[in-house]
């Protein structure tokens, strides 16, 4: 559920 958060940190 953190795909959006991970994508931003990537």
From Swiss-Prot:
The keyword Lyase does not apply. It comes from the Eukaryota. GO terms for molecular function: carbohydrate binding. One of its GO terms (biological process) is defense response to fungus. The keyword NAD does not apply. Keywords: Antimicrobial, Fungicide, Hemagglutinin, Lectin, Plant defense. Has strong antifungal activity against M.arachidicola with an IC(50) value of 9.8 uM but lacks antifungal activity against F.oxysporum and B.cinera. Has hemagglutinating activity towards rabbit erythrocytes. Has antiproliferative activity towards L1210 tumor cell line with an IC(50) of 3.6 uM. Lacks mitogenic towards murine splenocytes and does not inhibit HIV-1 reverse transcriptase. Antifungal, antiproliferative and hemagglutinating activity is abolished by incubation at 100 degrees Celsius for 15 minutes. Antifungal activity is abolished by incubation with trypsin at 37 degrees Celsius for 30 minutes. Belongs to the leguminous lectin family. This is Antifungal lectin PVAP. It comes from Phaseolus vulgaris (Kidney bean).
């Amino acid at each position: 559920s953190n795909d959006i958060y991970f994508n931003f940190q990537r």
